[in-house]
Swiss-Prot record:
Gene Ontology CC annotation, any one: cytosol
Signal peptide: none
A Pfam cross-reference name: Hfq
Record key words, sorted: RNA-binding, Stress response
InterPro entries per record: Hfq, LSM_dom_sf, Sm
The keyword ATP-binding is annotated on this UniProt entry: no
MF term (GO), any: RNA binding
Record gene name: hfq
Protein name in the entry: RNA-binding protein Hfq
Annotated transmembrane regions: none
CDD domains in the record: Hfq (cd01716)
NCBIfam families for this protein: Hfq, PRK00395.1
SUPFAM superfamilies, alphabetized: Sm-like ribonucleoproteins
Length: 78
């Protein structure tokens, strides 16, 4: 993925992770997963509910937070 794509993706996922915001993740095949983002990298998202699932980013269609979240596209992952 290009660096430009990371400029929005990483701060958004990081804000969801840090604030423990519950999310619904819709996969390209229509399956809905729910939980909290535990961690992420360039290729995968770790989603925690009763178990931790490794979800490949290429399989994700949409990430929907349960509540509004403020994030800054220029912030870094920590």
């Amino acid at each position: 993925m290009s660096n430009k794509g990371q400029l929005l993706q990483d701060p958004f996922l990081n804000a969801l992770r840090k604030e423990h915001v519950p999310v619904s993740i819709y996969l390209v095949n229509g399956i809905k997963l729910q939980g909290n983002i535990e961690s992420f990298d360039q290729y995968v998202v770790l989603l925690r509910n009763t178990v931790t699932q490794m979800v490949y980013k290429h399989a994700i269609s949409t990430v929907v937070p349960a509540r509004p979240v403020n994030f800054h596209p220029d912030s870094e992952q920590s």
